[in-house]
Amino acid sequence: AKAGFDAWDFSMFDMCKYDWSAGCFLPNDNPLASDNYLAFARRLKQIGLDNGILCNQSHAPFPSRGPIIPYLKRALECTAEAGGKICIIHPDNYLSAQENAEMYFDLLPFAKECGVKIATENMWGWDTEKDQSSFAACATSASFNEHLDVVNDDFFVACLDIGHAEMRGSGEGAANMIRALGNRLQALHIHDNDCWHDSHQIPFSMSIDFDAVVKALKDINYSGYFTLEASSYLEAFTPETTQKGLCDLAASAKRLSDMFEAL
């Protein structure tokens, strides 16, 4: 809040820790893994409100398969308790739209009980021979819209990861995908990269054309938040200087918002 943000994104990646090679969960002292996970979510909400910011959206743990699935409902619960309206739940990278829809169909009744929309996201794989990203679920406009069409529910929307959309090999370009998604696009993950790797860097620091991105958002009358997913930028800061990094990130989001309003 002191950095200048007006909302916070509830990331729940550490809600569960699973050793895929051993086939078992790992010890986890994260409050979201405890029996008091809802109380923790309520506490975060109150801290935000006490400082003048609200939870706008969240991110469930991933990958969305097997033993992780039960935690996706917990993520929806926590989103509701924190005050968030959208929970991003990854599709399985390598399943079809029809196969991924089965998971979303299972989750949607509970999401509606919670009053939280589910957003799917554009993913990517990696082609080691070509040394570039490769197709994964929702990576193209056609795949993304197919996922949305199969589920066909007002509580199932799109979160476009701007960086993923710009990665060489899989992405179609963020501006193209924004226009293809239209009013189904209700959430964003914004970060910068070299249009090759998934860098999750601060906007305006690398190669993405944010003028084109913002123009496309304006063209579809986007009405959601400009939510950053640029935590890699903070890795260069120490605990003592992290506030400066947060201020930089907030300033980049404000710049995007100002660009949008100026059009």
Task: Please provide the spans of the model-predicted regions.
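A conditional alpha-helix N-cap/helix-loop micro-motif detector
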Residues: Y37, I68-I69, A97-N100, A137-T140, ...
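Structural motif corresponding to the early beta-alpha repeats
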Residues: A3-E102, K112-K117, K218, S223, ...
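Surface-exposed cleft-lining segments at the edges of enzyme active sites
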Residues: I88-A97, M123-A136, H164-E166, D198-Q201
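Short, structured loop/turn "capping" segments at alpha-beta junctions
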Residues: C114-T120, D154-C159
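Histidine/acidic residue-rich metal-binding segments in metalloenzymes
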Residues: M103-A111, D149
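Histidine-acidic metal/acid-base catalytic patches
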Residues: A1-A7, F13-C16, F25-L26, R42, ...
